[in-house]
């Protein structure tokens, strides 16, 4: 018999029981809970095909289950607040055919406790759609029913569903309505990303910042547990509609803190995570009220040592957990053995930090 157990949650909060599912036919298995190498004295009971551990103190634990000659080992953690420990993943398929939640089940088994819903929105400047089914900004079919199902599955599994939200991107229509909200070059040209998204001025004095914060609040009111505040890494020097320079290193920390406050008016447990693309502007945003430090890695940070350094410096600046979006070359386009070795080396460098 092959013994495979599953935790019912990706992470546990203090006061919650820890539940493990058992294969059919397994009765009264031997169970040992560890903290590092030390056994933890706790009473374990079985109810049907479920092992139930009592609420445990904050910490990380291992558990071994034996039934006859078969053995299974796993691990789990207990935290006071899920924002204290972040293991980050993402989902990107929300069509009418994607209302099932096997993807969330898989993330639960991997212990991811925060999941970004990437490109779920109707528009960059209007996150929630006017109808249930819609086309996202890239023209892909999207269904709110699928999003609702995955949000509910995440919350039931101890996973925080995080809504993607770009901090300064707007469609041409909104730019035409509010050109005074845009960011400009020094010679007065409106700045665009990929030729179709307009950069908006995030300074507190600009109406755009109130607009996007209201959109973030709506997303949390819809059911999300926070916002992934995305940036594109550039530009770094911009001007407003009156040809005045806008200091993004000053404006971004203020926006992050205002966003954290805004989403918590809808849900006190909600939070924000800001994408400091290629570690910019790390020193400015490190001490903001974001839940974790998130760095999307691009050249010239393309060596293993760079991954190590990014994490060490970000942790030193912020005292928070660090999430790296470090993109490996797709395995389909590379030698499989070489790609796996590259992954293992990357993981070793990250773990060493």
Residues covered by each model-derived region:
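Extracellular ectodomain segments of secreted/surface proteins
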Residues: 1-26
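Extended acidic/polar, glycine-enriched regions
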Residues: 40-84
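An acidic-aromatic substrate-binding cleft motif
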Residues: 72-123
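Active-site-adjacent "subsite" loops/lids of carbohydrate-active enzymes
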Residues: 93-97, 163-222
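Short, acidic/polar
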Residues: 94-109, 208-220, 276-284, 339-347
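Aromatic- and acidic-residue-enriched carbohydrate-binding clefts of CAZyme catalytic domains
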Residues: 121-147, 174-203, 233-250
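Active-site neighborhood of glycoside hydrolase catalytic domains
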Residues: 204-293, 298-318
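Active-site-proximal substrate-binding groove within the catalytic cores of carbohydrate-active enzymes
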Residues: 285-288, 304-353
